[in-house]
């Protein structure tokens, strides 16, 4: 089996926040790293989502042409994701030629199958701005929940998909003007109504989907699918290859999911790999998507309808890992509202691994979760710095001071070591099971339990006391503990990869040893006497109360 993994495409309109990271890219990366470690063939694809009104609005605010703005943002985002250790096999752009080509191709296939129709619609025209206002160019009050900053394409508060004309008290996002009038314009529609039965049949077969994902898909289907407009009166986007529509582009939610395929094509072209084997005639491919819940309607309904309507054997997703929202002191993390902590800011505060661990430990899997600075402090200090970092520091420093920079000889493992081995084996298998099942909070809890096991062992065995009476027994305890460090490095690798590399280097592991699976690493006798090691710098810096108070004041955490 080969594993295709995609995470929801981060939008180009600004640096993403912690909620974006934990709701798609981070869990996808952890899953990809774990599967690679297990020896599986993995392809992890992502790209920036660059079309639509938010990109144009952000470019206007930045005083740049939209193409220049998107190019700069792409490189900024790509660099930040690299610093966070996101291991994309390819990170592309929906503005790339491959995506233009494939988007137009899918449209033409749908048109051939009579799933596209022209319609004349009424849409807002801003008299003061002298232009049509599609999607997010209109802001107003949501008719469903009353949220006053709802956008013309979707309410970010209740996730309802909207049209601009549904908004109460609509206004131009550009100028704030309420001098709007309805004018007619011809557009192209995807006949979701004609594809409804096929989509429902496909959704009904997805028995492994989570309650969150399945319920959102069924809610849409039960409300009845309506034809969806897939063109916009914009300049920036994929041009519509139809006479009479030369001044229109495709709706961002039509071309964006095609970006998964087009980015794979770009990867294949660059690396001389067969990209089509991942997307066509791909019975041996298991495809998993990662995204937050506001993206689920498009990925469970509109994108599958596009594939089904093409009447071609494109790969359909096998499992969608949907996430709820990460909230920040009473409100959802939001790029458009600039609420919360953004990824560039986060890296100035703490290391990438601190954030990776804390976020995935609190991933909003079954319900919304809340970020607090106190929780961040607790998990960095107690779980990372104490349970892992302090264990490594105590063992390697003690070994260096008493035995030198090689593992000492002597002693034979006894009942305590046998019991420790059984416990570690059980925890490693639980960890692997949870990662296979995409249960990230449980996986992180199990990893922390594995770290605690080592601390409990040395508290009982107390090598610094034992050394005074039995140096051979102490040597055996030390070797066991250093093998625990090796196990911690490998089992932690999907979660905190930068720390893992520091541990690999400290233990001077060979290339083969660094590629061990968690199961292979469970043997607590593998590193034998005579092996060299180094004492690394402290792995984690603790966060004190003064810094927490400062961060709460700076980022509105009250």
UniProtKB/Swiss-Prot annotation:
Keyword Glycoprotein: no
Residues binding ATP, per UniProt: 335
UniProt motif ('HIGH' region) ranges: 10-20
Any one Gene Ontology molecular-function term assigned to this protein's record: ATP binding
Biological process, per Gene Ontology: methionyl-tRNA aminoacylation
Matching Pfam families: Anticodon_3, tRNA-synt_1g
Cofactor note: Binds 1 zinc ion per subunit.
Residue numbers binding Zn(2+): 142, 145, 155, 158
A GO CC term attached to the entry: aminoacyl-tRNA synthetase multienzyme complex
EC top class named in words: ligase
Motif ('KMSKS' region): 332-336
Family: Belongs to the class-I aminoacyl-tRNA synthetase family. MetG type 1 subfamily.
Complex formation: Monomer.
Stated role: Is required not only for elongation of protein synthesis but also for the initiation of all mRNA translation through initiator tRNA(fMet) aminoacylation.
Name this polypeptide is given: Methionine--tRNA ligase 1
Name of the gene this protein is made from: metG1
């Amino acid at each position: 089996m080969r594993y295709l993994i995609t995470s929801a495409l981060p939008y180009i309109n600004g640096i993403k926040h912690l909620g974006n990271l934990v709701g798609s890219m981070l869990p996808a990366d952890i899953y990809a790293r774990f599967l690679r470690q297990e020896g599986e063939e993995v392809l992890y694809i992502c790209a920036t989502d660059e079309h639509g009104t938010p990109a144009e609005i952000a470019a206007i605010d930045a005083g740049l042409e939209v193409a220049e703005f998107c190019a700069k943002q792409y490189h900024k985002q790509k660099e930040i994701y690299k610093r966070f250790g996101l291991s994309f096999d390819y990170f592309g752009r929906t503005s790339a030629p491959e995506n233009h080509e494939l988007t137009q191709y899918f449209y033409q296939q749908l048109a051939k199958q009579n799933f596209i129709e022209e319609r004349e619609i009424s849409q807002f025209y801003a008299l003061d701005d002298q232009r049509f206002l599609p999607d997010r160019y209109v802001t107003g009050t949501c008719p469903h929940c009353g949220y006053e900053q709802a956008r013309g394409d979707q309410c970010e508060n209740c996730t309802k998909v909207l049209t601009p004309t549904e908004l109460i008290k609509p206004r131009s996002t550009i100028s704030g003007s309420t001098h709007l009038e309805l004018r007619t314009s011809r557009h192209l529609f995807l006949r979701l109504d004609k594809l409804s039965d096929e989509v429902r049949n496909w959704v009904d077969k997805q028995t492994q989907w989570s309650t969150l994902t399945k319920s959102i898909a069924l809610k849409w289907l039960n409300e009845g699918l309506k034809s969806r407009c897939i063109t916009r009166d914009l300049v920036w986007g994929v041009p519509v290859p139809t006479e009479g529509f030369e001044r229109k582009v495709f709706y961002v939610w039509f071309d964006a999911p095609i970006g998964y395929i087009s980015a794979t094509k770009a990867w294949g072209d660059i690396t001389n790999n067969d990209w089509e084997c991942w997307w066509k005639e791909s019975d041996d491919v298991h495809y998993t998507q990662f995204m937050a819940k506001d993206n689920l309607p498009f990925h469970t309904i509109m994108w599958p309808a596009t594939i089904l309507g093409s009447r071609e054997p494109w790969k359909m997703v096998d499992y969608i890992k949907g996430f709820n929202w990460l909230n920040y002191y009473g409100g959802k993390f939001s790029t458009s509202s600039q609420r919360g902590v953004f990824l560039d800011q986060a890296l100035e505060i703490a290391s990438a691994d601190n954030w990776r661990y804390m976020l995935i430990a609190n991933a909003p899997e079954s319900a919304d979760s809340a970020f607090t600075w106190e929780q961040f402090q607790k998990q960095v200090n107690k779980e990372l710095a104490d349970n892992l970092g302090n264990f490594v520091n105590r063992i390697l420093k003690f070994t260096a001071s008493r035995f030198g920079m090689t593992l000492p000889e002597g002693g034979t493992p006894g009942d305590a070591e046998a019991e420790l081995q059984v416990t570690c084996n059980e925890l490693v298998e639980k960890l692997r099971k949870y990662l296979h099942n995409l249960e990230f909070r449980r996986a992180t809890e199990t990893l922390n339990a594995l770290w605690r096991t080592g601390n409990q062992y040395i508290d009982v065995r107390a090598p610094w006391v034992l050394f005074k009476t039995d140096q051979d027994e102490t040597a055996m305890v030390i070797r066991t503990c250093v093998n625990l460090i090796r196990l911690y490095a490998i089992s932690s690798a999907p979660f905190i990869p930068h720390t893992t590399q520091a541990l690999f280097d400290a233990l001077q592991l060979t290339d083969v040893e660094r590629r061990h699976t968690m199961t292979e690493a469970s043997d607590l006798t593998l590193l034998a006497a005579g092996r060299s090691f180094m004492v690394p710098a402290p792995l984690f810096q603790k966060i004190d109360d003064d810094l927490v108070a400062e961060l709460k004041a700076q980022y509105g955490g009250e």
